[in-house]
Amino acid sequence: PLSIMGKERKWILKEPADPEKVGRLSAELGIDRVLADLLVKRGVETFEQARSFFRPSLNDLHDPFLMKDMDVAVERVRKAITTEEKILVYGDYDVDGTTAVSLVYSFLRRYSSKVDFYIPDRYDEGYGVSYKGIDWAGDNGFGLIITLDCGIKANEKVEYAATKGIDVIICDHHLPENTLPPAVAVLDPKREDDTYPFDDLSGCGVGFKLVQAYSQKYGIPFETLIPLLDLLVVSIAADLVTMVGENRVLAHFGLKQLNENPRKGLHAMATLSKLELGHLTIDDIVFKIGPRINAAGRMETGRLAVELLTASDDHTATMIGEKINDNNNDRKSIDREITQEALEMVQNGSALSTDAATIVYNPTWNKGVVGIVASRLVEAFYKPTIVLTKSNGFITGSARSVAGFDLYEAIESCADLLENFGGHVYAAGLTLKEGNLDEFVGRIDQFIAGKITDEMLTPVTDIDAKLEFSQITPKFFRLLKQFQPFGPGNTNPVFLTENVSDGGNGRKVGAGGVHMKLDLIDEKQPFHQIPAIAFNMAEFYDYIKAGNPFDICYSIVENYYRGNTTLQLRIKDIKERDEFI
């Protein structure tokens, strides 16, 4: 389907992998060539690699002491615990930050009663380590602060903490600047001088490595860390880090924990999201659980999220869960409203820029949802997007990019105009003085225009392989499910099937009939119908209902509904066929 700008998605069929490798793997594993091709494209070429891909093992986790500064960090935590020094676990207000704080706080509480946590207020303090937070720590006698999912750029703040006699250990996964903060230890796999084998951990993942290292050094059995993995999988899924290597292993066991024996707070969230334990997937976290936990920090306070995730009884978990669910409903209506206003600004010419980038500003918008609105505008206009609002006298906002374009670099090129900025290649935050706004818009627009290519501005659907419906057998699907957990870098494969049509049961579903449920057939199997769902594609309904043939690209998902599990195609895009056969 078209985006608002009428940009049609370009379908790109990936080159097949080396046929010799595919043939060898297919024979060794006794699997379909299509599946062997998918595996080789994901770097799985040998029987051994296939074993560790299909059967993730906790033995595949890296030694946490390979991370720079880990030994110092562990010793400093040990000193705090043995001398009964007060430890403050400090983290960002989003899902990654609040799960990280909950994980490290829960662990430390087992060995010390002198532990507390602190989540900065999104509106009053903003992102990252704040002077207010350090003052609070100082006033309350804390000697050690452990920062999670933030701190890699907090040079002045760490110096300020030192003047109050407070040591800082930083656990972060954001991109560092040239000079690291003068902390006791800086744990960040993205450090230039770090040789840790995997650099795409979530913030919570870095916190977990600290806890794992502490346990390893002081004889605490790894089994006691397993109950923390439900928090970790929530961060890995919601923060959209790559689902490869160590992350995939941790997510695999985290999902197991989440489904079989989750903590009370996550159980409450699943129930409020109308999800059933035993069947939760990464998608459920990304689309249902993650946004709810995030809503606490967007609408009220991130502290609520930590209270939920560390709740020890059902009553507390349900009570806080319901409060957070209300926050999420408020967030939804506000983000709908602001998205509508932003779309209108772009269309009526009152945006700051609609050239190389989409840049919109409204001082009254809610700071908590600008990131979501930026993502919606990328969907609509498919170009790098910055959504700005006003907070505490500064202009502040969120930036989101399109595939292949490094927006962080573009923001960094305007560093002299900014009070602060941070983030990743595709998603970042920034703050500037109002007087610098016009120059910032002009400069970043020019920078983006000079770097971005037409290819990057065309939305693409990457297709893994062509498939005929007859190939989708129970065995094929059973093996495909073992590719999970899916996420960036290990996506649910996208298949292309040509010349299909609806078997006659096609109907519109959803509020306002914007989605379609279809029962598809292809010409080779006219009596074998495969159920499919197409979100936001009702524009094709009349064409399909008239019996016309079309091509689809889709992924195959398991649809769990009222005790029944069925296979379903989730359609990503539809193309009408010109020629009628």
Question: Could you describe each region identified by the protein language model?
Answer:
Residues L2-T83, V234, K288-D326:
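Cofactor-/ligand-binding subdomain signature composed of acidic, glycine-rich
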Residues L39, D92-D94, I146, D172, ...:
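Divalent metal-coordination and catalytic microenvironments
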Residues V104, R109, K114, R248-M345, ...:
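Acidic, two-metal ion nucleic-acid-processing modules in DNA metabolism proteins
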Residues D139-L144, C150, N155-R298, G302-L308, ...:
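Functional cores that coordinate and move charged inorganic groups
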Residues N348-A374:
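Flexible, glycine/threonine-enriched loop-and-boundary segments that flank and lead into catalytic domains
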Residues I386-S401:
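Short glycine-cluster motifs
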